Amino acid sequence: MTEGTDNALLERFEQDIWSKVPHLEEGSETRVVNATPLVDMTADFKECAKTVFKLDLDNADLKVFGKMDSTLLTGSIKVRPAANIINDAIVTGKLRSGQTVIEATSGNFGIALGLLSKLGLNVIALVSRKLQEGVFEELRNGNTRTIDL
């Protein structure tokens, strides 16, 4: 952290966003990707093996897990880089309470940045008029102001 770090903003960010988004945590002996959403897909895998490949794995001692980024905040993998960029900006003092973040986006990254509104920051997304209405809705639901280009 630097002298200019907004510690109150960093604390809110870590509690409300960072703790819920997969990110690399480095300890003295380990490196762990925290909060990665895994779903047990064993039953589906066995059914697929039986149906598609005619393999009977019912008695096989195995577990199959899938990484399901659709279960992340915002439902998109784009929340990962957004959270890392936000974390770096807060830690280095580049992003502080009361500031506005402006992003040109076609959707998911802007939606992920919209999480900043939960921290009391303003987010403006510069978007194409041709963007799908569903994306506009998600941006607005996240309290992100949109400006059509």
Describe the predicted segments one by one.
Residues 1-149:
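PLP-dependent amino-acid enzyme catalytic core
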